[in-house]
UniProtKB/Swiss-Prot annotation:
Gene designation: Fignl1
This protein's domain notes: The N-terminus is necessary for its recruitment to DNA damage sites.
Enzyme Commission designation: 3.6.4.-
Biased composition (Basic and acidic residues): 288-299
PANTHER family linked to this entry: AAA DOMAIN-CONTAINING (PTHR23074), DYNEIN REGULATORY COMPLEX PROTEIN 11-RELATED (PTHR23074:SF75)
A molecular function GO annotation: ATP hydrolysis activity
Keyword Nucleotide-binding found: yes
Binding site for ATP: A413, G453, T454, G455, K456, T457, L458
Distribution of this protein across tissues and organs: Expressed at high level in the testis. Detected in pachytene spermatocytes and in metaphase spermatocytes (at protein level).
Keyword Magnesium found: yes
Naturally occurring in which organism (per UniProt): Mus musculus
Lineage: Eukaryota, Metazoa, Chordata, Craniata, Vertebrata
Name of protein: Fidgetin-like protein 1
Record's compositionally biased regions (Polar residues): 322-331
Residues making up the signal peptide according to the UniProt record: none
Keywords recorded for this protein, A-Z: Acetylation, ATP-binding, Cytoplasm, Hydrolase, Magnesium, Metal-binding, Nucleotide-binding, Nucleus
Length: 683
């Protein structure tokens, strides 16, 4: 049995040696890809951990090997060079920062004017248009006023534009003196080609809704529409709704010359089409019924616009939206449900259930906007915030920006090395940017890691206070949202406001929850937020002159992503307070209370509190301060004066030690020290 076990051990070792040699050859080879080298480095790190777990190598040797291969692995992962690195965030960064145009001038469309004319449906429409034009000349169809004032509805016409350079594109709408006048939308005509009329009504089952007309009025007629595409409707359908549909249909048709197969030329032509449509106010009106019955709600519908047209309107007519809205709406629209509700771009949404709190909510919004007053335009006039939503700027100003009291370096006990390093690389460069330029400039990010309760948050506030910078305190929950894309917008808004408030310090508490390592099971929204944060911190669009410092604090540094660790240049270990720091904490807290501790008793308290963090020392002093209160009888608490309460004594600390325990275990301290030796920048 012993022989078989020894043989199996030897076999396992030989396999491990073969794997080690194979991976080592991969990382030293010049023909392997960076991806293969990264996989080989990960395999080597696993071999090192396996050998150390089986006590095959010593701790010092394992630490040195792990540090060496981790640095080489990080160099491949974070390298921007395509030949020697993976550039792990390149695709996401290029997708966000790239603003190249998708259309090319050399692209040709497969759809031409000749192909359109050969389509059977277009041929049917042209034939139906000719029949309709002939039916208008029959006197029995309807009483039509010729060469008079405009009628209540007009004949729809559709002109197909052809390819002549001298063609009059988008000419103004003219009146046909031989027939009835054309409705809005028929102004889109081109002269070189014969007009192709829309199909008109061929059956006149209902005739002549005539009435006694006075001066300035004209007769109206209702016709029965014959559908072209097989859709049958009831005979009782009224003509105003049908004409409204035709009006909305015609307003979206555009004439394209034959030489406009190029997408960019076609886009320019469509933009000129939109200009003509928006400049003619009659295109937004639908024909009405008789004036004695008033205006119908359907006739006040604004003209429907596609997403491209609406985007053009927002870009070209910014600042005149209110005037455009008042011109496009005729009368007051009723709040109704169903098909009669306005569905245009200026229509207001009407919920199916009436909300009784609308009045109070509107009053609250008006009160809030009036209370903000002149403070809102102050931070919206900056060029950095022109593309940021005002509500996000207000949220950052009110909730994320910290307005607490200033913090001094003397308020932080111990951690002298961390304080000296921060003064050297952060505070002084922000105070004197004229001296600290070039390589002396401040870093983009700092990571403060260590056990909880050691003053990492206090150090972040002190950096902002002593450097005169604006302090932003955020967490992972303040950047997440249930709506898609809101988290990325909040990150962009945060850095935009920080650029306007330079110098600025962005403190992220528990940064491991925001910039954790990526995995296969990670949600897409958190990945996008993480990518946007890294791009804003150090990406293609960032400027080296920005004085924005990101300070991250965590007690789980091993869970931070490799790319985030690379951007957080200075990684400082904040250990547990030493004996002198614990004595300073006790002295500062007891100076505000009545205390009769001697120096020897204070030293005993400091000696017994070995392994306590700063938060543990505060809890110990708080528990000891309750000792004099507990010594009183319950009946005396209601009548005793504050001066009659005895001072805090050493016996109170002895009782406090029985209930207060250190919150950091030796195993956790060993983990922090090992991570500091591998990735830390301190002693």
């Amino acid at each position: 049995m012993e022989t078989s076990s020894s043989m199996s051990v030897e076999t396992t070792r030989s396999v491990q040696v073969d794997e080690w040699q194979k991976n080592y050859c991969v990382v030293t080879s010049s023909i392997c890809t960076p991806k293969q080298k990264a996989d080989a480095y990960r395999a080597l790190l696993l071999h090192i951990q396996y050998a150390y777990a089986n006590s095959e190598i010593s701790q010092v040797f394992a630490t040195n090997l792990f540090k060496r291969y981790t640095e080489k692995y990080s160099a491949i992962i974070d390298s921007d060079n395509v030949v020697t690195g993976l550039n792990n965030y390149a695709e996401s960064i290029f997708a966000l920062a790239g603003s190249r145009q998708a259309d090319s001038n050399k692209w040709q469309s497969g759809l031409s004017i000749d192909n359109v004319f050969k389509m059977s449906c277009v041929q049917e429409m042209m034939q139906a248009g000719k029949k309709f034009e002939e039916s208008l000349l029959e006197p029995a169809d309807a009483s039509v006023v010729l060469c008079k004032e405009p009628t209540a509805f007009e004949v729809p016409q559709l002109s197909v534009c052809g390819g002549s350079e001298d063609a009059d594109i988008l000419s103004s709408s003219g009146h046909d003196t031989d027939k009835t006048q054309a409705i809005p939308g028929s102004s889109l005509r081109c002269s070189p080609f014969q007009s192709a009329r829309l199909p008109k009504e061929t059956n006149t089952t209902k005739t002549c809704l005539t009435s006694s007309t006075s001066l300035g009025e004209s007769a109206t007629a209702a016709f029965h529409m014959t559908p072209l595409f097989g859709n049958t409707e009831k005979d009782t359908q009224s003509f105003p709704k049908t004409s409204t549909g035709l009006n909305m249909f015609l307003s979206n048709l555009s004439c394209v010359p034959s030489g406009c197969e190029n997408p960019q030329e076609r886009k320019a032509f469509n933009d000129s089409d939109i200009i003509d449509i928006l400049s003619n106010p009659t295109l937004n009106k639908a024909p009405s019924k008789t004036e004695d019955r008033g205006r119908r709600e359907d006739n006040s519908l604004p003209t429907f616009k596609t997403a491209k047209e609406q985007l053009w309107v927002d870009q070209k007519k910014k600042g005149h939206q209110s005037q455009h809205t008042s011109k496009s709406s005729n009368g007051v629209m009723k709040k109704s449900l169903g098909a009669g509700r306005s569905r245009g771009i200026f229509g207001k949404f009407v919920p199916p259930v009436s909300n009784k709190q609308d009045g109070s909510e509107q009053h609250a919004k008006k009160h809030k906007s009036s209370r903000a007053g002149s403070a809102e335009p102050a931070h919206l006039t900056d060029d950095c915030l022109k593309n940021v939503e005002p509500r996000m700027v207000e949220l950052i100003m009110n909730e994320i920006m910290d307005h607490g009291p200033p913090v001094h370096w003397d308020d932080i006990a111990g951690v002298e090395f961390a304080k000296a390093t921060i003064k050297e690389i952060v505070v002084w460069p922000m105070m004197r940017p004229d001296i600290f330029t070039g390589l002396r400039g401040p870093p983009k990010g700092i990571l403060l890691f260590g056990p909880p309760g050691t003053g990492k948050t206090l150090i972040g506030k002190c950096i902002a206070s002593q450097s005169g910078a604006t302090f932003f305190s955020i967490s992972a929950s303040s950047l997440t949202s249930k709506w898609v894309g809101e988290g990325e917008k909040m990150v962009r808004a945060l850095f935009a406001v920080a650029r306007c408030q330079q110098p600025a310090v962005i403190f992220i508490d528990e940064i491991d929850s925001l910039l954790s390592q990526r995995g296969d099971g990670e949600h897409e929204s958190s990945r996008r937020i993480k990518t946007e944060f890294l791009v804003q911190l150090d990406g293609a669009t960032t400027s080296s002159e920005d004085r924005i410092l990101v300070v991250g604090a965590t007690n789980r540094p091993q869970e931070i992503d490799e790319a985030a660790r690379r951007r957080l240049v200075k990684r400082l270990y904040i250990p547990l307070p030493e004996a002198s720091a614990r004595k300073q904490i006790v002295g500062n807290l007891m100076s505000k209370e009545q205390c009769c501790l001697s120096d020897e008793e204070t030293d005993l308290v400091v000696q017994q509190s070995d392994g306590f963090s700063g938060a543990d020392m505060t809890q110990l002093c708080r528990e000891a301060s309750l000792g004099p209160i507990r010594s009183l009888h319950a009946a005396d608490i209601a009548t005793i004066s504050p001066d009659q309460v005895r001072p805090i004594a050493y016996i109170d600390f002895e009782n406090a030690f029985k209930t207060v325990r250190p919150t950091v275990s030796p195993k956790d301290l060993e983990l922090y020290e090992n991570w500091n030796e591998t990735f830390g920048c301190g002693k």
